[in-house]
A protein has these predicted regions:
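Membrane-embedded segments
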Residues: 61-135, 139, 159
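An N-terminal hydrophobic leader/cap segment in hydrolases
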Residues: 9-57
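Alpha/beta-hydrolase fold nucleophile elbow
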Residues: 142-155
Length: 275
């Protein structure tokens, strides 16, 4: 190969080796977080269609105004804090929550999602989860208090739920299509990249699991190509508390909730906690 040709090839290789990781590093928020914002008119329309759901706001320590949907349950019912997937606008759960009528629900809008202000990151999602927990946690003289708090995380939300369970006392944890860490999932999908060096939002649930003693329901989709069940199994095996593994046969990552055993297994778990 002539020296000029070799030089050109080396330049192309250098651009690829440096440029691709740099691009991934700079654009990782767009790859991880896919927020769907709601206008004031859309929020009002949702409120009209789901009259039992209440639009609630809280102010974070940095002044950001964050939003959630509160669907009260029966008197003295546990409250489920719901954290959705990376492209999920959670108001759809106002209709789905009727499938689990024995509990109340708090459907959390991440920053930049729904009616919440700001921009999402691992740290802001974690801080806001604690904010919502503290707002509804058992306390005296509060009309919002719940006697028990459960956390429910789906996909990306599993990382938020696990971290909250590690930082606050929760009475039960439900994880749907969860991962061990965002780093491990990213490395699976991008084996040619040094993901551990590039990723700012690690969501390392695996390191927290051995310190969590709350009962766990782990629901996985056997045909999940986005977060293959092997990642959930590592998290499940590391969990310190009582646990149950529910595989949804033939379900994919985005179709788990359509499986006939999805709500059946969730309700069984919830009812066992209440008995």
């Amino acid at each position: 190969m002539e020296s000029g040709t070799l030089s050109a090839v080396l330049k192309v290789v250098a651009v690829v080796l440096i440029g691709v990781p740099l691009l991934v590093f700079l654009l990782q928020e767009r790859l991880i977080f896919m927020p769907l914002r709601l206008s004031d008119a859309a929020v009002a329309d949702i409120q009209t269609r789901f009259a039992k759901g209440k639009s609630v706001f809280a102010q974070a320590a940095d002044g950001t105004r964050v939003h959630a949907w509160h669907l009260p349950g029966p008197s003295d019912a546990p409250l489920v804090l719901y954290f959705g997937g990376n492209a999920e606008e959670v108001s759809w759960m106002l209709g789905e929550a009727n499938a689990a009528p024995t509990v109340g629900w708090l459907l959390v809008d991440y920053r930049g999602y729904g009616a919440s202000e700001g921009s999402p990151s691992e740290e802001t999602l974690a801080a806001d989860a604690v904010l919502w927990y503290d707002k509804f946690a058992p306390k005296e003289n509060s009309e919002l208090q719940a006697k028990k708090i459960y956390v429910f995380g789906r996909s990306l939300g599993s990382g938020v739920a696990v971290r909250l369970a590690a930082e606050r006392k929760v009475d039960a944890v439900i994880l749907v299509t969860p991962f061990d860490s965002m780093t491990a999932v990213g490395q699976r999908h991008y084996p040619f990249l040094p993901v551990s060096l590039l990723l700012r939002h690690r969501f390392d649930s695996l390191s927290r699991a051995p310190n969590i003693t709350a009962p766990l329901l782990c629901v996985v989709a056997t045909r999940d190509s986005i977060i293959p069940p092997e990642h959930a199994k590592l998290l499940y095996d590391a969990w310190a508390g009582p646990k149950r593994w529910v595989p949804l046969e033939e379900a994919g990552h985005n179709t788990a909730d359509a499986h006939p055993n999805y709500w059946r297994s969730i309700n069984l778990f919830l009812n066992e906690r209440s008995s």
